[in-house]
């Protein structure tokens, strides 16, 4: 059974209860309340319990190969005994041959592959560092307008590693969002803007991390032109497609369970922030989420969609409220917390 690791420096559980939370900037928002469920099917799915007798393994695990989500005494997606499931990013040690062939298992369980090609293959990191955590404390900063007037900047920059989403600006917002950036996690649309319009919010020391590299169209029309345009001045990495598929599988598994708990239907498509959270959980000893608050009709009256512009939010593609329910379940088996102006949610217990 997977046991939660304690966050260094935690003294106890936060007294803040069930605030209205949300996710980052990418698409839409929804609202619902969460209850502190302790022993439920979702926790069994996350922990990937493997009992020697009956009763410990949930029907979810019998129906799906969710044991790939667990390893050792940590919450992780990698399984060191199975090489096809052990990669988080694409690297030269898991992309083979002259054309950098990437092997993975698709969403239907079929073994498949694609070639990164010379342009992208040459910029891949040498080693994947599979199954290791490379950072201590980490912050993942979403783009919610609720970050305005939060004064979280210094707190965010105090983490060992910081990820930002879709190249969000930090200039003029230092007090609220900080400036430190270790990773820039981006979807293909923002990668395309980078190619077409340039990089306004250049952060030369950060790693640009993309999760849609398995598509040949994306590689030819977006990522290859991106690498050719910026060369070595832009550090680029790609999530391994097998890891992306496993993160999507986990979304679907938890969605089925949480829909039953909440008696509510959620959208099928994960937002980019879902993959960002799952990546950081593989690379960090602990993770704090900032700007992850649901954009709803109620929230619209109190804060803009983004902290850096006046774009109008939409509510028809993703279920950000579901993502928060899932993150709160993650927090029961991994040192993950969600920051709000009123306090912390999901703080690790003693």
Feature annotation, model-predicted:
Residues 18-19, 41-42, 46-350:
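Metal-ion/cofactor- or nucleotide/acyl-coenzyme-handling active-site neighborhoods
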Residues 1-45:
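Long, low-complexity intrinsically disordered regions of secretory-pathway proteins
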């Amino acid at each position: 059974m997977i046991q939660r690791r304690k966050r260094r420096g935690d003294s106890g559980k936060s007294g803040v209860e069930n605030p209205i939370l949300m996710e980052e900037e990418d698409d839409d928002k929804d609202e619902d309340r969460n209850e502190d469920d302790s022993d439920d099917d979702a926790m069994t799915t996350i922990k990937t319990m493997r009992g020697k007798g009956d009763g410990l393994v949930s029907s979810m695990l019998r129906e799906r190969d969710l044991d790939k989500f667990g390893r050792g005494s940590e919450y992780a997606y990698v399984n060191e005994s199975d090489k096809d499931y052990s990669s988080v990013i694409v690297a030269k040690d898991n992309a083979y041959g002259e054309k950098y062939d990437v092997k993975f298992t698709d969403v239907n369980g079929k073994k498949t592959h694609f070639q990164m090609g010379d342009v992208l293959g040459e910029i891949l990191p040498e080693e994947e560092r599979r199954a290791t955590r490379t950072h201590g404390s980490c912050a993942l900063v979403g783009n919610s307008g609720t970050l305005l007037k939060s004064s979280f900047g210094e707190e965010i920059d105090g983490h060992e590693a910081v990820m930002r989403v879709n190249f969000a600006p930090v200039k003029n917002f230092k007090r609220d969002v900080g400036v430190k950036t270790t990773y820039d996690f981006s979807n293909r649309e923002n990668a395309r803007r980078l190619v077409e319009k340039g990089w306004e919010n250049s952060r030369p020391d950060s790693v640009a991390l993309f999760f849609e590299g398995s598509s040949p169209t994306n590689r030819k029309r977006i990522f290859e032109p991106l690498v050719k345009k910026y060369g070595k001045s832009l550090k680029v990495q790609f999530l391994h497609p097998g890891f992306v598929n496993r993160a999507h599988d986990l979304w679907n598994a938890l969605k089925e369970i949480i829909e039953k708990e909440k008696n509510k239907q959620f959208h099928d498509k994960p937002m980019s922030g879902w993959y960002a959270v799952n990546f950081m959980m593989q690379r960090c000893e602990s993770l704090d989420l900032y700007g992850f608050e649901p954009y709803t009709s109620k929230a619209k009256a109190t804060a803009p969609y983004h902290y850096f512009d006046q774009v109008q939010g939409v509510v028809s593609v993703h279920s950000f409220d579901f993502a928060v329910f899932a993150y709160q379940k993650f927090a029961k088996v991994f040192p993950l917390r969600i920051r709000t102006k009123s306090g912390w949610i999901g703080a690790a217990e003693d």
